[in-house]
């Protein structure tokens, strides 16, 4: 495939890119790159971004059993990751939260699964095509489910409350 792309570049601009999974994967990569200068495998544990593929990627962290919790957004690692990562993310030693628009093997394995609206259909925003071109989308119709942003905002608020000692019983929609 790479040889074909090279040959075709003699006549036109041609690139070979892997097909991406569901969700706005290209958008996530673009935002991480824009905010940190690194495309993936970014670690913020020291308070600043550090890049080290082979050490800081999700697969690496899960395979080494270093994560005690995982929040998976619009992705299906249980269907796609290597066996050691899947075994850890589905174990009792790693609390799994799935935030997704549909049911997946990951949402089925999760300790907590939250269904969200579909961006570009129920929620507006910017998505990136697989060739890195941003597209602004408006919602076509309403959804009974909250957006990813609404869920993550409430989750962040709750974590901050718990961190500050304000224990509450539940998070309402």
PLM feature spans:
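Non-catalytic alpha/beta scaffold blocks inside enzyme catalytic domains
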Residues: 1-173
